[in-house]
Each structure stands twice: as C-alpha cells, then as structure tokens.
Amino acid sequence: MASTTPITMEDLQKALEAQSRALRAELAAGASQSRRPRPPRQRDSSTSGDDSGRDSGGPRRRRGNRGRGQLRDWSRAPPPPEERQESRSQTPAPKPSRAPPQQPQPPRMQTGRGGSAPRPELGPPTNPFQAAVARGLRPPLHDPDTEAPTEACVTSWLWSEGEGAVFYRVDLHFTNLGTPPLDEDGRWDPALMYNPCGPEPPAHVVRAYNQPAGDVRGVWGKGERTYAEQDFRVGGTRWHRLLRMPVRGLDGDSAPLPPHTTERIETRSARHPWRIRFGAPQAFLAGLLLAAVAVGTARAGLQPRADMAAPPTLPQPPRAHGQHYGHHHHQLPFLGHDGHHGGTLRVGQHHRNASDVLPGHWLQGGWGCYNLSDWHQGTHVCHTKHMDFWCVEHDRPPPATPTPFTTAANSTTAATPATAPAPCHAGLNDSCGGFLSGCGPMRLRHGADTRCGRLICGLSTTAQYPPTRFGCAMRWGLPPWELVVLTARPEDGWTCRGVPAHPGTRCPELVSPMGRATCSPASALWLATANALSLDHALAAFVLLVPWVLIFMVCRRACRRRGAAAALTAVVLQGYNPPAYGEEAFTYLCTAPGCATQTPVPVRLAGVRFESKIVDGGCFAPWDLEATGACICEIPTDVSCEGLGAWVPTAPCARIWNGTQRACTFWAVNAYSSGGYAQLASYFNPGGSYYKQYHPTACEVEPAFGHSDAACWGFPTDTVMSVFALASYVQHPHKTVRVKFHTETRTVWQLSVAGASCNVTTEHPFCNTPHGQLEVQVPPDPGDLVEYIMNYTGNQQSRWGLGSPNCHGPDWASPVCQRHSPDCSRLVGATPERPRLRLVDADDPLLRTAPGPGEVWVTPVIGSQARKCGLHIRAGPYGHATVEMPEWIHAHTTSDPWHPPGPLGLKFKTVRPVALPRALAPPRNVRVTGCYQCGTPALVEGLAPGGGNCHLTVNGEDVGAFPPGKFVTAALLNTPPPYQVSCGGESDRASARVIDPAAQSFTGVVYGTHTTAVSETRQTWAEWAAAHWWQLTLGAICALLLAGLLACCAKCLYYLRGAIAPR
C-alpha cells in the first residue's frame, strides 16, 4: 500500500524533473513512446472512460495529456512530421498492468512560515484552482504569502463578433514548463494554458477559450511580451483569441514558434525573430519629415514651364502729346501696379487710389473714363482693354491733314495720331475718324458736349507694364495643377482658351505666339525628360507622389491584419437604413409663408430665406425732378426767388434755382385786356426781350393769350394775371440709394413635415423623414442679385435687380456699373436735360393723359378768396431712361426676387412605386423675351398643359420641368427665332421678342474683352466618363484608400469600447 506521507510542492517538483530527465534520455536513445493499452471500445481518445489498469472502486481524473498515457517533454520542440507519422504507424508493445494506486491523502503545502497547509483534493474539482491542478498545471513557485511577480499573472483576451464589441478578459498563470504540448492531430491544446488567477469568465467564454485552433493569424511582439492571435468558430459564432505566450522555457532556450502559422513577419531581429524592429510611428514620422522637406523646397523647385521661343522685339508706341498739351503732361496718370486691380492714379502731384476715383468697370478691365479737367474743357483718362488713353477736347480748329499712327501687329495699343488732335467736327452724325484713339462716350460736366455724338478726339498713351510672370496653384497634390498669372503684359498675347489673360487668371494652359505655358505634372515630367531630367521637374514629380506614398504606408500599416472589408460592411452598410418607400403622392404647395397642404403627412412652408455673398457697392444720391411756382393776380416786377418770396417757398426755390439745367418761365394771362398793363401786350414778342429790359429776370417770358383769368375772381376783366414756374433736376438731401451685390445666391425653403423641420435647396431637394421621402420641385435660384436700399425721406425700402448688369451694353450708365462713394454724396449718370414747362388750362382735355418724359404741366387754380389763386403742378417721368432715377430703379428691379410665380411641387414616396405622369402636349401662349447668344438668360413664360409635369424644350434644348399651369423661367438661348416649344409631344411655335448681341452695342465704342456664354450642352455618361477618365481613376483610388482608412478607424472604435470596459 502506498505511503500516506504528505507530499509537498518540492517533492512534486523533484518528481516532475526526474520524469522529464527520464523522458529526455529515452527520446535520445531512439526509444519509441510507450502507450498504455486500452480496451477496443475505449480506443477513441475523445471518449471518457476508465483505464484498463485502474480500479473501479474510485474514479481518477486525468491530468492533461498524461491522463491518456502519453508522455512528452514540453520544454522541447515537437518531433518533425515524418517521425511523428512513423511513430503513429508502429504498434505499441503491450505492458503489464500496474496495480491501481491508492487514493492519495491531502498533501501538506509549504507556507514558508514553518507550518503546512492542506493540499487541494485531487478528486473532482470544486473551484477554478482545483480544475487547473486537475488539468496538470501548477501555480508558479513562489511563496503564497508574498506578492506574486509581474509575470506570474498575465492577461489574455477574447471577443466575439456575434456579441458585438464586448471584450472578455482572462487572467491566468503561466506554466513554466515551456511551450504547451500538441495533441495527436498537431493542434494546440489551449486547455493546458488555462490556469486562471482572476475572476472565472462565463461558461461560454471558457468553452471558447479551450476550443482547439491550430491557425495563427499573427504573432505580435510588444516589449518583452509575445501574443498569438487566432480566430475560430464555436457553434457557428466567430471568436477572436489573443493568447499570451511564454518568453523562455525551463531549460533556458527561447520558446519556438507554433508550427501552424499563416503569416510570418520577415523583419529580422537578433533577439526575437518574429518581432517588428520599427513600428508605425517611426515610419510615419519619417514620411512626414520627407514630405516637409519636399514641400519646403517646392516653391524653389516648382516653376511653371513655358515652352516658348525667344520673344520677338516689339516696337514701343510713341508717346507724343503734342505742343498744345504740354501743360497737361504733368497730369498724365501712371498706373502703379495693375490699374484694373486697384493701382494708384497720379493726378497732378497727388497719388490717389484708383478704386476711389475710377468707375467700377475700370477695375474689371472694361471701358470707362475719368474727368480730370475743370468746367471749361474736358480732359479725360479713358480705359479700355486694360489700356489707358489720354483724351483732350477743347475749342481749337482741326489741322488740315492728320497723320494717324498704327502700332505693330502684336501690340494691343490703339492707333495714335502723331500730331496734336483736333476737336471734333460739328454735327452729331460726324465722327472723329482717324483722330479717335479708343475714347468712348464721355460724360462731361458742361452742357456743350454735343459734338461728334459724344466722341472725344484724343491721344493714346501707355504705361510701362511689368513683365509677364506666372505661378503654380497647388491643390494638395491633386492634378491638374493650374497656372496663375501674377503679372501680364498685353503685348505678350497670352490667352486662356482664346480669352486674353489678366493678372489673377487661373488656367491649366496658356497660349501665346511665343509658345505655351503650363504647370501640369505630366507636362513637367515630359519636359524634364526632354531636358535630360532637370532637378526642378523631378522634384515636382516627387512632391506629387509623396502624399500618396504616405497614405499607402498608413493604410498598409493600419489594415494589414484587420478585415477592412468586413468592418466596412458591418459599420457603414449595416448602419445605414434606407427609408422604405410605398405609394407615391403628388401635390402642390403655395409659396407664401404659412401655406400648408396634405400629402400622406401634413407639410407646411415655414419660411423662405436666401444665402449669398455680399459685396458693398457704395451709395449714391439719385437725381430728383423738383418744380415750384406761383400764381399772382398782377405782373410782378422781379421774377425771381427773391421777388416772389411771398408766393414761392424759399427753400425749394433756392434749391431749384441753384440746380443744373433749370427751366424758368413767366406767363402773362389775358394781356390784351383794356387798362392796366394792357399796353405791355405789344411787347410780348417770342423772346420777351423788351420786357426783360424793364423787369430783369433769368426766366423766359411768354404770353398766354386765350387763358382765362377767372382765378382772380372779383376783379374787372381788364386785370392781368401772371403765372411763374421753376423746375430743375437737383440732388435731394433726403434721398439716397445704397447698392449691394449678392453673388452665389441660394434660396432655402424651410418646410415642416409632420412637425419635423427640413430645409431644401436646388442642390438638395429631398427630405428624409420617418414617414418616407419628400421630394420638392424647387425653382431655380435667382442667380446674382443687386440690392438697392432706397431711403426716400425716411421711408426705406429695398428693390432687387436680377442678374449681373451688362456694363458693356445698355446698362453702362446704371447704378451697378458705377463706383459710388460711402457717404452717398456722389451724383451718378449724365447731367439731365433741361425740363420743359407747359401752361395747361383747367378744362384742357390734355389733363386726362399723363405728362411726357421731362415735362412739367402748370395749371392755375381758382382761390377761395378774392385776389387769391394757386397752381397745380404735374411732373412727368424723367426724360432720360439711362440715368439713375427712382423710376429707372423701379422699372428695372423687383420687390421679391426669390418668390416664384407658381407653387412648389411635392412628391411624397410611401408603398407601390408608380410612375409620375408626363405631359405630352405642347404648352400654350409661350413668349420668349430677351437676348440670344449674349450670355444673359432670356425670359420664357407660358402655360404648361395638364396630365403631369411638362419637361419643356425650346428648339431641342431642355429648359426644365414645370407642373401644369403658368410657368416663368429663364434660359440661355443659342439660336435666333423662330422657337419651337414642346412638352414631350407635338411642338408649337412660341412668340419671340429677342435681340442679338450686336443690337446692344454702341457704334464707335471700343469694349473690353468678353466671352459669349452658351447654354449647357447635353452629353452621354460614356462621353462624360471619356472626358474625365483621369479624375474618375483618381477618384476611385481615393475612394478605395478612404474606405480602407474609414474601415480601420471604424473597426478600432468598434473594439475600443469593449477594450476599455471589458466584462
């Protein structure tokens, strides 16, 4: 019978070491492994049963693989596959059965304090510690009353994709017997590593932890710790396991790698072959350093490449000003930097900012003039095609034969007379001929500006432009790069797609008679190859590739051992729940705020607002037509504001009297009556010259024979009544107009869908709601707007001008084509013509109509007392429609630019998709008004037929879709009339009132460069893809890289939640 002496841990350790030495000797001698014979019904190792030599009186727990009768040295590597197969094929020799050992008594464990403690029972385990001992694992050799070393208890991890991002933490002891053994099929037995020293995980986690798995996804090294990552399935659920591996075995040798690995790091290290020598932070920092060096030298190495020949020698135009203009030579302006981009203008000895004194279109490279002279002679600086002209006009007889001068073909300078210019010929139909040097219609300060159709003869001068310089616009390394014109000399002739280049122009390629210029990396690389690979172009290619190399390094480092596709599918695709559509309902919603309608859910228009970029255009004071007068029952001696002070208001009379181009008239009514002043009637000749000798006045004196003097009732018929009227255009002190430009306007419609707010625009006309998707037929945005904030005698209101003005056409004198002063003190536009005064009787049928433009009607009114009468004054519209007047602003503007003429179409998608009906009949009463091929949209209005939405086409061009009813839209027209309109069915002819661009131009005026805008062309997707193949390829690469990065980030965040708070 076996001894019942208590077994200590030291005795157990010595026995295990002796057994290990015996096994090593046996394996060294080449002896085969001995196996304990089993009954035939118990050959299967997976079944549990009693051994043949064990007594049936008491069960015995097997200890790991030793319970199967297999002995193996765990501190050494497993035998090769050939030897393992050979050993399995041999039949083991039978051995005599051993006597069943007695059930051992509970041993005594050394406590280190001279005492002993009962050893755990080796029977059925009752706790995790006993279960670990029963599996053959021991606690580490240390004093249990002292603190365990760091390596005594380590942490491994498990997580399952079926349970979400939930991590399970398993704390266990290391076995110090080396690498864990293998089963007979060559798989690991993780149960031999399970020796928990922390809380017992749930049963399904323990079952997953003990699941055998031979595939290893990777071996991770961090400091002195090593982990093996595995993934496997348990009952259809995919699990991930991260196991802590021992660093050294009992005999001091390094632990070998597991035999079944699917990936192995090839980077070598002297100590740990599978460790990574350099991690991602070092590689990423090195890449950032290279990128910083490359970008830092990009400005020096990246220069636009111009493939050009030697520039031709251009003759300089002469600067002859003539002997008669020597006193004006010191006033010639000289542009400091770029005149059309805010340069300086020298007037006399003073330098002023060009933006303060020049018209607005001067700065935009258009046409304009600036008056530098006094009232007696017109001296102007004119600007057109980014060139400056010095124009002088005075009363000197013209020379007999002027000699014109024409510059070289490559120069854009206009013709310049070699001699002093002469004034224009008399007559409005004459022109300056060879004397014209680019000066256009002047706006002079004196009234004698009626010669040559307002064309002023003059000299042309040019300033010395700086040489043409280019720069490259880098956009984060994304092709194509653009060429930026820093300074431009017009004589060089650089153009971008046929349009002359100006400072600030951005273009992929510039062309001139001297060659081409580009910043494209492909062209730069080609030119670099042709020029023996110069350093600057090689550096350009390197800078282009560095960002993509860094992205590739980061993506490869982040995604090399993570399932990017699975994580992207799980996080991105599974996280998006598209709305389920059902029936389609279509209705309309009025555009007034507060309107509501009922689709499957109630929809209400909460409000309308628009967003834009605002640029202040200054302020101006509009011209104001003001008139006053008096009705007197006698002929006054002094017909003026002073002489008529008792009948005429003093303030308006003085304001009108001091105005420009005033009209003042005095009428004598019933002058041929007997007595009194009747003898003066013979002196009322048409000019009233004799009357002026006795009654000094600045007014015109005219008789008014035939008018009734009933206004002065209660007098004899021989009395004489006089009427005095005064009118002029003045600057009203309480009327101002401020101009603001709105660009990139976008209308935002604020809807309330079943209580949920939703904003729709032309870019995003959809609303995703819990009830379905709402699609809104949003009218097009108004485009560029001009806001006129008019403050007339304290009553402020805003008017809106649609579209950008045509400053090179009929809008050259409009408010938006001027640069106004901030203090609203500038009067804009040409000086108004003199108003016309007319005396009209009270019963004249003419009073049933309205006064004509520039007319003022004066009517005497009978007073309520004797010798008392009054005047009724009616003023007509202004006599010049191209000048800034309140009526001009009201005629060319609207009060609500973003209010569409028709309702909003609402399409609500809810169960059975149905196709929306489309109108197949032609629209009715379609009218087209505007201009074609001029870059500005024309107005198209009419009535859409019923039966569904009308997809309107004008001469084959798609204009838009409109619901049944009245529609108003704007469209760019490329063809002249007639216009055929259709809604998908038969076409009908529309009435048209359009003009071409030639009808908008002035004769004899030189304009700046402008392009003709056309409507958007139609092309197929294949044509579009062929034209943008490079952008599509680059976009696909960027999308793949971005998807990989997002997948890595999503998966990291997905698992980080469970790693921070494991269960």
Curated annotation (Swiss-Prot):
Extracellular side: 301-534, 583-1028, 1050-1063
PTM annotation: Structural polyprotein: Specific enzymatic cleavages in vivo yield mature proteins. Two signal peptidase-mediated cleavages within the polyprotein produce the structural proteins capsid, E2, and E1. The E2 signal peptide remains attached to the C-terminus of the capsid protein after cleavage by the signal peptidase. Another signal peptide at E2 C-terminus directs E1 to the ER, with a similar mechanism.
Keyword Disulfide bond set for record: yes
Effect of residue 32 to A: In strain: Isolate RVI/CAL.USA/91, Isolate RVI/PAN/99 and Isolate RVI/SLV/02
Consequence recorded when altering residue 915 to V: In strain: Isolate RVI/SAITAMA.JPN/94 and Isolate RVI/TOKOYO.JPN/90
Documented effect of changing residue 100 to L: In strain: Isolate RVI/ISR/88
GO biological process per UniProt: clathrin-dependent endocytosis of virus by host cell; fusion of virus membrane with host endosome membrane; virion attachment to host cell
Entry keyword annotation includes Transmembrane helix: yes
Consequence recorded when altering residue 26 to G: In strain: Isolate RVI/ISR/79
Topology Cytoplasmic: residue spans: 556-582
Residues modified by glycosylation: 353, 371, 410, 429, 658, 759, 791, 1011-1012
Bias-annotated ranges (Pro residues): 93-107
Residue spans of biased composition, Basic and acidic residues class: 70-87
UniProt-reported outcome of changing residue 313 to A: In strain: Isolate RVI/MYS/01, Isolate RVI/SAITAMA.JPN/94, Isolate RVI/SHANDONG.CHN/02 and Isolate RVI/TOKOYO.JPN/90
Effect of residue 413 to P: In strain: Isolate RVI/ISR/75, Isolate RVI/ISR/79 and Isolate RVI/ISR/88
Disulfide cysteine pairs (residue numbers): 153-197, 590-595, 619-824, 641-653, 699-712, 758-767, 807-817, 931-934, 950-983
Result when mutating residue 915 to T: In strain: Isolate RVI/Anhui.CHN/00 and Isolate RVI/SHANDONG.CHN/00
Region (Human C1QBP/SF2P32-binding): 30-69
Record: residues binding Ca(2+): 670-671, 718-719
Name of protein: Structural polyprotein
Gene source species: Rubella virus (strain TO-336) (RUBV)
